[in-house]
Amino acid sequence: MIELKHVTFGYNKKQMVLQDINITIPDGENVGILGESGCGKSTLASLVLGLFKPVKGEIYLSDNAVLTIFQHPLTSFNPDWTIETSLKEALYYYRGLTDNTAQDQLLLQHLSTFELNAQLLTKLPSEVSGGQLQRFNVMRSLLAQPRVLICDEITSNLDVIAEQNVINILKAQTITNLNHFIVISHDLSVLQRLVNRIIVLKDGMIVDDFAIEELFNVDRHPYTKELVQTFSY
């Protein structure tokens, strides 16, 4: 379970980025954080990860095995390491897996799942496409077997086919390894396919919180309706 109680945060004392955030996410629930750029979505993720401490309020996690997948994969990889080295580091550091044969078998299984060519393993991050690197980014996080995964705009560099492939993989992971994941996105179609609950942020405050089946409910907050209408166009 993840719980935020009256969380307020700002990068300086004069302006708060998040104000009085109250969220409870039980195990098994996948949540989408929806809102425009600058509303505080990524800051919220950083707080859950423990990268920052709230100015006020408390954050409780029942499981410390939390990882994130960021929007820009190039900054997440060591530029001097091959893709294979970066992936195997996750297996060693998070799972204590040192046997090369076992590591290779896991990599081959995941390459097939993510529809990626094994020849790409010898490449540096700068030598593969943005979409391929983002899929490797997701793969590396899943190889580490986190219990909670925070996904920050992870489909922004993917084409339609690769996007659906990643969505299917993440949904399958909730059945096997993940307790839940949090998806931060401005893309409503991604959230509709991935999560069962949406929290809407505006100007650092929660303005709406509902089950995905209630997205088009007449009782939705006016800002939520505005986002839905904008996406429809």
From Swiss-Prot:
One of its GO terms (cellular component) is plasma membrane. The lineage of its organism: Bacteria, Bacillati, Bacillota, Bacilli, Bacillales. Residues 2-228 form the ABC transporter domain. The complex is composed of two ATP-binding proteins (NikD and NikE), two transmembrane proteins (NikB and NikC) and a solute-binding protein (NikA). Its EC number is 7.2.2.11. It is an enzyme of class 7 (translocase). Keywords: ATP-binding, Cell membrane, Ion transport, Membrane, Nickel, Nickel transport, Nucleotide-binding, Translocase, Transport. It comes from the Bacteria. It is a peripheral membrane protein. GO terms for molecular function: ABC-type nickel transporter activity; ATP binding; ATP hydrolysis activity. ATP binds at G35, E36, S37, G38, C39, G40, K41, S42. SMART domains: AAA. This is Nickel import system ATP-binding protein NikE. CDD domains: ABC_NikE_OppD_transporters. It catalyses: Ni(2+)(out) + ATP + H2O = Ni(2+)(in) + ADP + phosphate + H(+). It comes from Staphylococcus aureus (strain N315).
